[in-house]
A protein has these predicted regions:
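A short acidic/glycine-rich loop-to-helix N-cap element
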Residues: 115-117, 151, 264-269
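Solvent-exposed loop/turn segments at secondary-structure junctions
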Residues: 64-67, 111-113, 143-147, 215-218, ...
């Protein structure tokens, strides 16, 4: 038997080819579609979604803040009336991947097979992390969409210029997570000065998406900012409470709370949870949101 010096393995790891971003994204999209196919056979919606929920998942829960961890996320889902029967199926229409191939996002359209007919047609946004066992959802949002025809054709992918090897260094990842949170705060701070419309234009990528209204997704800065009035004063602020970021430092997600600038006197205003997917072209470039 041949014996290999430990340095051999270190050199081999260092010289291994970087992952192909397109191949990595194709694997993520395949996983998203496979979870949907599996969900179609489930006894209820929560059971169908459960296999893809990550152990460290953080999911916004309106009126309650956040469900943190897989068990809490599934418990919050079981409280949703429309999730108690039938099943969910979905189709992604866009995906994005980090340069190291360890994190990504998808968004698309979801349909419930039971429950209130007016609430069955939905849309979703998912942020994914790659685990040894496969892709899992770390942040997730779905909402009822407005009536209307939508295209389910795949959009152009969100890809880095090139792939890089993942870095297994907690300090590096922590620094990237902190930078994502800092970008979110700077976004909110800027909105206090120039208003929401201008801040959303300044801090978004040209292909940014907003899912909060309409039958489909608002894609592109003109569509994202269409609902904001020019010069309208900012009445809200927001910040990050949880975040994930790829070791390549080019993709991350911030999860936090939107609060009123004039909170209620009795303290009943708990704010509204949100999450934002951020991308930058390189670790020395500014973060810009790409999906929310």
């Amino acid at each position: 038997m041949l014996a290999y010096h430990p340095i051999f393995f270190a050199v081999a790891a260092a010289t291994a080819p970087a992952p192909s971003p397109q191949v990595a994204l194709d694997e993520l999209l395949a996983a998203d579609r496979a979870f949907s196919a599996q969900s179609a056979k489930a006894s209820d919606v929560t059971s169908g979604l459960a296999p893809m929920v990550d152990r460290e998942a953080v999911v916004p829960v309106p009126g309650e803040g956040f469900a943190i961890g897989r068990d809490a996320v599934l418990a919050s889902m079981r409280k949703i009336p429309g999730f108690k029967e039938g099943h969910a199926t979905w189709t992604p229409v866009r995906g994005g991947i980090s340069a190291d191939g360890t994190q990504g996002f998808t968004y698309g359209f979801l349909t419930l097979s039971a429950g209130d007919p007016a609430k069955r047609e939905r849309k979703y946004l998912a942020y994914w992390v790659k685990r040894p066992e496969g892709w899992r959802v770390a942040a997730y949002r779905q909402q009822v969409r407005e009536a209307g025809e939508v295209s389910r054709a795949m959009m152009a992918p969100s890809l880095p210029a090139a792939g890089v090897q993942p870095v297994d260094d907690p300090a590096v990842i922590a620094a990237h997570k902190l930078s994502v949170a800092s970008a979110e705060k700077a976004f909110s701070d800027r909105a206090q000065i120039v208003g929401l419309r201008n801040a959303f234009r300044e801090y978004g990528r040209e292909d940014a998406m907003n899912m909060y209204s309409g039958a489909g997704f608002a894609v592109g800065l003109d569509a994202v900012t269409a609902g904001f009035k020019e010069g309208e004063p900012t009445t809200i602020h927001w910040s990050t409470e949880h975040s994930f970021a790829a070791s390549s430092g080019d993709l991350g997600v911030s999860i936090g709370t939107i609060r009123s600038n004039t909170p209620s006197a009795d303290g009943s205003d708990k704010g509204f949870p949100f999450f934002t997917v951020w991308r930058r072209d390189a670790p020395d470039q500014p973060w810009r949101y790409i999906a929310e």
